[in-house]
Amino acid sequence: MSSSSHKRIIGIDFGTKRIGVALSDPLRMFAQPLGTFDMEGLVRVLSRVRDDEGIELVVVGYPMSDKGEENRMTGVIDRFVAELRESFPGTLIETFDEHRSSRTAMKILAASGSSRKKRNEKGRLDTAAACLILQGYLDSHS
């Protein structure tokens, strides 16, 4: 496993259908897409990254409302975070405001020249949103 200073940070965009996942580089400067998974697949990939690279922290997007208030999804995210903590005891798991991450991800994908069909491929938006969540976290802690 890597030394403590080079452990990775995972970013997660939780959705009811898919879970977008991003991974920091070893220096924790950039978010890289890892893919989209269901819960079972997520546990497998987190276990693999933990064993191969080490995980310092898992950052889960927390969807606050425009007014900064909790909403219907925040309760779902709270339960998801509790499940992650149970599955990965000893791993730090934090939430990070993901306000409008999916909307921003869609705009970035559109601006990148991706066709509408490409932008709407399963998981592409979820992974892009996970990257935005993780990059926001990395930028705010640099």
From Swiss-Prot:
GO terms for cellular component: cytosol. Keywords: Cytoplasm, Hydrolase, Nuclease, Ribosome biogenesis. It is found in: Cytoplasm. SUPFAM superfamilies: Ribonuclease H-like (SSF53098). It holds the Pfam family RuvX. CDD domains: YqgF. SMART domains: YqgFc. Its EC number is 3.1.-.-. GO terms for biological process: rRNA 5'-end processing. One of its GO terms (molecular function) is nuclease activity. Belongs to the YqgF nuclease family. Could be a nuclease involved in processing of the 5'-end of pre-16S rRNA. This is Putative pre-16S rRNA nuclease.
